[in-house]
Amino acid sequence: MRVAYRHFQPVTVFYARGVGPYGQSAQHAWGAMVSWLDQHQARKRVKQAFGLFRDNPNTTAADLVRYDACIPVMLDADFPPAPGIGRQTLPGGAYAVHTHVGSYDELGGLLSHLHSRIVPERALCVDYDRPFMTVHLNDPAVTREVHRRTEVCVPVVPIAMPLPRNDAGRHAPDTAALARRLARAG
């Protein structure tokens, strides 16, 4: 599995939340998001979308697992608020990223493999304070399933790498520098 390391900047998004097992909650959230975009004739303006996996399905009851379907806030968007559509800022930081081409049905297995096997093998630790996510790079409405490109992203921190010091002499994380180090080491 090819894995790159990337530092994501925080981004403000519109989101729709689905609750329940990930297969069902993702379908519900994307249905609500696409419906809202279509109401405003805005779907074609979306160039990238994010799927956020908020909970660990192994430790959270299935009916409480949360999934957020997200699109970046467009600067000229003057859409009125709608029930079920919120606004939030995705946290930035370092992520281990695998680019998948093909069916969305494979994303859960890829996230699990990246999380449980690849990240530990590369001396990284998962940052459970940030969500696992997928970055959807094309529109499934116009892209054949075999050509759909999705980045599968697991938030990471190093296990054994010195952190830079801040002004007070305490260790302070610098995730941009971390991402550069990881990219060189990868």
Q: Residue ranges of each PLM-predicted region?
A:
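A solvent-exposed interaction/effector surface
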Residues: 1-186
